[in-house]
Amino acid sequence: GVSPEKGIITAVVAGFVVSLLGGSRVQIGGPTGAFIVIVYGVVQQYGETGLLVATFMAGVLLVAMGLFKLGAVIRFIPYPVVVGFTAGIALTIFTTQIADLFGMNFGGEPVPGDFIGKWMLYFRHFGSVNWANLAVGMGSILLIVLTPRFSRRIPGSLVAIVVLTAGVWALRTYAGMEGVDTIGDRFTIRAELPAAAMPAMDWEVMRSLFPVALTIALLGAIESLLSATVADGVTGDRHDSNTELMAQGAANR
């Protein structure tokens, strides 16, 4: 629901803060698909200012959770919840990317924020599939999957970006192919940083956004601490849950 440069700037700043102050030595903070539905709904109803207010409030709640030592609660979450949580995130990301993978054209019809609504929209507009777009997307997936079989030093995602970007550029330049959109075709990414400013705090808006802020805080806490727990199992380290929560809160503020 927001422009790409906002996501890039947020990822860099928040990732730096979480890595600097976080309670896990190997965890890196960044954007996640679990928040897509929530963020989209907030932007649609309250605009970007509402999203800023909700995120700021969520940051305050996360810091408070860390100060009150609520990070230890992660120990009581059943393991099947961890598995279901991870699978749910994967399914959410998959669902949100279907339209772009298939190059669908919805004719100006807004994309619903809920899971079922998205799939109903996809089925209604399946006839608008852009096959050239789908071919490039499937090529990316194949390169990412197959590259590790030949070289584990070079990331498959990097190979896919380089090879297919060059291929699409060559086809557009020398063969006149226009079926595949680039990021530049869809968005205008400005190079300058936006001026930092506090959002307008309206008490009525804050009260209506509190449930959303609480959801963001709880989801962020659970996802961050579950990821840290999984990382502990791989590295043998032990993270500090409360420090991690406060770092996540500072990054959101």
Regions found by a protein language model. Name each.
Residues G1-R253:
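Transmembrane helical cores of multi-pass ion-transport proteins
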